[in-house]
C-alpha cells in the first residue's frame, strides 16, 4: 500500500512540475514604474503559487507573491494584476537603487523550492518604454488585422492615388 501511495504522489508532483512553467519574464518602464510581465503555462488544476523577488548585491528581497513575505519597504510600492497565463507586477517610484536581478518563480506550495523561474537583469538606463513591448507582445492580433486590412484595401484599389 505504501508503494502505491508513493508512486501516486510522485506522479502528481511530476504532473504539476510539467504543467506549471514560467515561459518568459520581461521588464519595461511605465512612467516612473517598473513593470514585470511574468508569462507562464498552467496545464494543471493546481493553483499557482508564485513569488516576485529582487536580488541586489547577493541579497534577495521578496517584492510580492503567495510564497514569501514581502519586505515592508516594497509593500506600498507594488501593484499586482493577474490574467490567465500572465502575472504583472508594478513597482512604483523606480530608481537606480532598485536595479538588480528580478525573478518570477512558481512553487508547489508554501516555501518549497521553485519548480520554474525566470530572471531578468534590470538597469534603469537600459529599460525600454512598455508601449512598444505591449503592442508587439500583447496585441499581435490587432497588428495582423491591420496588415491584412491594408492588403485588402490595396487589392481592391481603394488606396490608389
UniProtKB/Swiss-Prot annotation:
Phosphoserine found at: 82
Glycosylation sites: 42, 79, 119, 139
Biological process terms in GO annotation: angiogenesis; cell-cell adhesion; cytoskeleton organization; focal adhesion assembly; integrin-mediated signaling pathway; negative regulation of axonogenesis; negative regulation of cell migration; negative regulation of protein kinase activity
Boundaries of every Ig-like V-type domain copy: 20-126
Alphabetical keyword list: Cell membrane, Disulfide bond, Glycoprotein, GPI-anchor, Immunoglobulin domain, Lipoprotein, Membrane, Phosphoprotein, Pyrrolidone carboxylic acid, Signal
Cystine pairings recorded for this chain: 28-130, 38-104
Signal sequence range: 1-19
Record lipid sites (GPI-anchor amidated cysteine): 130
GO cellular component, one term: plasma membrane
Pyrrolidone carboxylic acid: residues carrying this PTM: 20
PANTHER family per the UniProt record, alphabetical: THY-1 MEMBRANE GLYCOPROTEIN (PTHR19226:SF2)
Function of the molecule: May play a role in cell-cell or cell-ligand interactions during synaptogenesis and other events in the brain.
Descriptive protein name: Thy-1 membrane glycoprotein
Species, as recorded: Macaca mulatta (Rhesus macaque)
Phylogenetic lineage: Eukaryota, Metazoa, Chordata, Craniata, Vertebrata
Gene: THY1
